[in-house]
């Protein structure tokens, strides 16, 4: 599974209109540090779509879940990650899966420890619609 998880930092992620942190700046930083993606060359902040909000009551943490559409092929991302990125240790591996409901559902259902199920579900519904995604999932 590949994810970008970053803590929001006021000084590091400060927006351009004041001292408040900017969630898009935080996401851009995470994409750079964990996957080696460069803003402007590989994506823009406008390519980031936040899809849902989550809260861990056990750890008193909140999270924004979303997707980003990048201008790179998956082989470019894997090669960049393999060559070393700042926070490579935060992901154990990158397992490319075609982004279709069928391929993603097959992957998720064969990897029981897969922890991004809610995020993946929201991303699939965003791209393909709830009815289609639910029908694919129901076939398992």
Spell out what each predicted region is:
Residues 2-12, 57-140:
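Nudix hydrolase/Nudix homology domain
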Residues 28, 32-46, 73:
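Secondary-structure boundary elements
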Residues 36-38, 51-53, 79-85:
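Intrinsically disordered, low-complexity boundary segments flanking structured domains
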Residues 41-61:
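Beta-rich nucleic-acid/ligand-interaction surfaces
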């Amino acid at each position: 599974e590949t994810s970008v998880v970053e803590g929001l930092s006021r000084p590091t992620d400060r927006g351009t209109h004041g001292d408040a942190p900017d969630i898009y700046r935080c996401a851009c930083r995470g994409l750079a540090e964990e996957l080696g993606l460069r803003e402007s060359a590989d994506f823009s902040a406008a390519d980031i779509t936040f899809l849902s909000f989550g809260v861990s009551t056990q750890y008193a943490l909140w999270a924004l879940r979303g997707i980003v559409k990048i201008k790179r092929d998956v082989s470019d991302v894997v090669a960049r990650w393999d060559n070393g990125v700042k926070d490579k240790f935060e992901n154990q591996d990158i397992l490319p899966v075609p982004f279709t409901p069928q391929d993603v559902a097959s992957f998720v259902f064969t990897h029981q420890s897969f922890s991004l199920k809610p995020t993946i579900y929201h991303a699939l519904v965003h791209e393909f619609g709830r009815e289609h995604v639910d029908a694919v999932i129901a076939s398992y």
